[in-house]
C-alpha cells in the first residue's frame, strides 16, 4: 500500500527531523536521500515555506512533488520582508508593485480558486491587505476597485 506524506518545509533547508523524519522513518526508506532531494528541488524557494508531497510506493520508490509556496510567502519575499504587519490596517510594512502581483498570480493560477488572471491578481492583492502591504503605493482595497473598474487592464494583459 502506497503512503503519502504532505509537509511544509523551509525551501532548500529541509532536515531529517520533524516533520519529515518521523513520517518517513517507519516506512524503511533512506530519509537523508529524500531530504537531500527535497532540498535540491526547493532550493529556488530559499527562505520560504514550501509544500512538499512525498509518495512512497510498495517497492519503496519515492516520488517527490514540490508545490508553490503560499501566496503570503511570495508577497513577503517580493516585498523583502520577513514578517507581515501585526496591525495590517494601521502599520504598513512594504509596497508591492502591481507587476509583481501579476507575476505571483500567474505563478499561483493553477492553485487558486480563480479561473482568470484578473481575479487571481485580486486574490493576491487581497493577501496584501492581511499582510500589511500596499500595492503601487496605494491601499490594496483602492487597487482592487481600480482593477474592477478596468484601470489596470493593460498590465493584466501584458
Swiss-Prot record:
Membrane spanning residue stretches: none
Keywords tagged on the record: Ribonucleoprotein, Ribosomal protein, RNA-binding, rRNA-binding
Keyword rRNA-binding appears in the UniProt entry: yes
rRNA-binding among keywords: yes
PROSITE patterns linked to this entry: RIBOSOMAL_L11 (PS00359)
UniProt-recorded Gene Ontology molecular function terms: large ribosomal subunit rRNA binding; structural constituent of ribosome
Gene Ontology terms: cellular component: large ribosomal subunit
A biological process from GO: translation
Highest taxon of source: Archaea
Record InterPro entries: Ribosomal_uL11, Ribosomal_uL11_C, Ribosomal_uL11_C_sf, Ribosomal_uL11_CS, Ribosomal_uL11_N, Ribosomal_uL11_N_sf
CDD domains per UniProt: Ribosomal_L11
Subunit structure: Part of the ribosomal stalk of the 50S ribosomal subunit. Interacts with L10 and the large rRNA to form the base of the stalk. L10 forms an elongated spine to which L12 dimers bind in a sequential fashion forming a multimeric L10(L12)X complex.
Assigned protein family: Belongs to the universal ribosomal protein uL11 family.
Function comment: Forms part of the ribosomal stalk which helps the ribosome interact with GTP-bound translation factors.
Protein name, per record: Large ribosomal subunit protein uL11
Organism: Methanosphaerula palustris (strain ATCC BAA-1556 / DSM 19958 / E1-9c)
Amino acid at each position: 500500500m502506497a503512503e503519502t506524506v504532505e509537509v511544509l518545509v523551509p525551501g532548500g533547508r529541509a532536515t531529517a527531523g520533524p516533520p519529515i523524519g518521523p513520517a518517513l522513518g517507519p516506512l524503511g526508506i533512506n530519509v537523508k536521500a529524500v531530504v537531500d532531494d527535497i532540498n535540491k528541488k526547493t532550493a529556488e524557494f530559499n527562505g520560504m515555506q514550501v509544500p512538499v508531497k512525498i509518495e512512497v510506493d510498495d517497492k519503496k520508490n519515492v516520488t517527490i512533488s514540490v508545490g508553490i509556496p503560499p501566496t503570503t510567502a511570495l508577497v513577503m519575499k517580493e516585498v523583502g520582508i520577513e514578517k507581515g504587519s501585526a496591525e495590517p490596517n494601521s502599520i504598513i510594512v512594504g509596497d508591492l508593485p502591481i507587476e509583481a502581483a501579476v507575476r505571483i498570480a500567474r505563478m499561483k493560477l493553477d492553485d487558486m480558486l480563480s479561473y482568470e488572471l484578473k481575479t487571481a491578481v485580486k486574490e493576491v492583492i487581497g493577501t496584501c491587505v492581511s499582510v500589511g502591504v500596499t500595492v503601487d503605493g496605494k491601499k490594496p482595497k483602492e487597487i482592487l476597485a481600480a482593477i474592477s473598474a478596468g484601470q489596470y487592464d493593460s498590465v493584466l494583459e501584458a
